[in-house]
Amino acid sequence: MEARLKELKQKALELIEEAKELKGLNDVRVAYLGKKGPITEVLRGMGKLSAEERPRMGALVNEVREAIQTRLDDKISNLEKAVIEAKLATETIDVTLPGRPVETGCHHPLTAVVEQIEDVFIGMGYEVAEGTEVEKDYYNFEALNLPKDHPARDMQDTFYITEETLLRTHTSSVQARTMENNKEKGPIKIICPGKVYRRDDDDATHSHQFMQIEGLVIDKNIRMSDLKGTLQVFVKKMFGEDREIRLRPSFFPFTEPSVEMDISCMMCHGKGCGTCKGTGWIEILGAGMVHPNVLEMAGYDSKEYQGFAFGMGAERIAMLKYGVDDIRHFYTNDVRFLQQFKRA
């Protein structure tokens, strides 16, 4: 049995030395140290030995097994190291090579326009107010002087979720909530950017979802001249100092009087062209003095406080500013289109 163990040890060590791959070493381990290997068989046969021989043979078996396992571990370590060194040799990095340029992302034109508009009004002392896109009918309509039976509701075809819940049709709902939540009923000066939803057929100038930015100022002694002056500053900041504005009478349930504002055409400079349909003017937003009913419903004394409000579509402003002829370009994720608006 002793000679058998020495023979097994010598043969196993030779096979380990000859192995060139990890798989070969694993085969040796299974063949010699596995449950069905010869060393295990020797252990099972030790029961036939005398009590005097058993301790000596047990120690010899352990010595042989440890010698094989130690050589296996050393060889496995050497092979793994060789594999890593070979891989590193083939994947050597030349640190002197120039780096690859980083592709810069595109600033989406709508994001750019909204940020520019916010910057203009923040510079005039406004705060940015945001609200939920899923809104109650009350704040979207009733609090804005549009009771349930008001015919002006037909001006906006609405996505209703339940009878009293809807996707907001304008960010005026944020204004209504801001006025109501102003416990002191003091001055307010906010702009409200956000997505709004209407059941419009998508075409070159309409979308069922679009970005709207509305503004609200509430204070004592607010006049129409304050509204006009504010809009003049906005237009010159967004479209250039040479832009002129024109206010036309209009109707909105939540303002009285109401106006629509046009700017002088940037293509023909007011002379008349295809862009402005020969008028020399382009409509960009609606505005007016806050209706007394809206103030009263929010808890304000309409005899003491007045206000003005305005609202515009970010897509409309972006189309005019960048010369885009189809609103759908903003939502098709066409990289060729978006790359035109990379930041310098």
From Swiss-Prot:
Keyword annotations: Aminoacyl-tRNA synthetase, ATP-binding, Cytoplasm, Ligase, Magnesium, Metal-binding, Nucleotide-binding, Protein biosynthesis
GO molecular function term, any single one: catalytic activity, acting on a protein
Co-factor requirement: Mg(2+)
Keyword Ligase tagged: yes
A GO cellular-component term linked to this record: cytoplasm
Residues engaged in binding Mg(2+): 256
Membership in a protein family: Belongs to the class-II aminoacyl-tRNA synthetase family. Phe-tRNA synthetase alpha subunit type 1 subfamily.
UniProt cross-references to PANTHER family, sorted A to Z: PHENYLALANINE--TRNA LIGASE, MITOCHONDRIAL, PHENYLALANYL-TRNA SYNTHETASE
Name of the protein this chain belongs to: Phenylalanine--tRNA ligase alpha subunit
Biological source species: Bacillus cereus (strain ATCC 14579 / DSM 31 / CCUG 7414 / JCM 2152 / NBRC 15305 / NCIMB 9373 / NCTC 2599 / NRRL B-3711)
Gene responsible for this protein: pheS
